From Swiss-Prot:
Residues 21-46 form a propeptide. Belongs to the disintegrin family. Dimeric disintegrin subfamily. Residues 47-111 form the Disintegrin domain. It comes from the Eukaryota. This is Disintegrin CV-11-alpha. It comes from Cerastes vipera. Inhibits ADP-induced human platelet aggregation. Antagonist of alpha-IIb/beta-3 (ITGA2B/ITGB3). Residues 1-20 form the signal peptide. Gene3D superfamilies: Disintegrin domain. Its main location: secreted.
Length: 111
């Protein structure tokens, strides 16, 4: 009961003002204390993000997902190692995904 009351008081005293509030708790003398901790300001529209890979609060990949975007990212997962991410042009060589990043690294065998 005290926790609920303290949360209500904290939210009333520290209303949402464009930044995210995390409620932390600690046990002091067997009384549960709850206090707000201000965290990073969210970009405009982050809470309404419709990107299927993006956690709208953290703007990072959702739990269980690898990536949000990039040439080696598809459906929130890294593409398999050896997948062509940049086709060769002229005398150039193809670039391939590593399977551990959404970036497309330059082929190390290029001159």
């Amino acid at each position: 009961m005290i926790q609920v009351l303290l949360v209500i008081i904290c939210l009333a005293v520290f209303p949402y003002q464009g930044s995210s509030i995390i409620l932390e708790s600690g046990n002091v003398n067997d009384f549960e204390l709850v206090y707000p901790k201000k965290v990073t300001v969210l970009p405009t529209g982050a809470m309404n993000s419709a990107h299927p890979c993006c956690d709208p609060v953290t703007c990072k990949p959702k739990r269980g997902e690898h990536c949000i975007s990039g040439p080696c990212c598809r459906n929130c997962k890294f593409l398999s190692p050896g997948t062509i991410c940049k086709k060769a042009k002229g005398d150039d060589m193809n670039d391939y995904c590593t399977g551990i990043s959404s970036d497309c690294p330059r082929n190390p065998w290029k001159d």
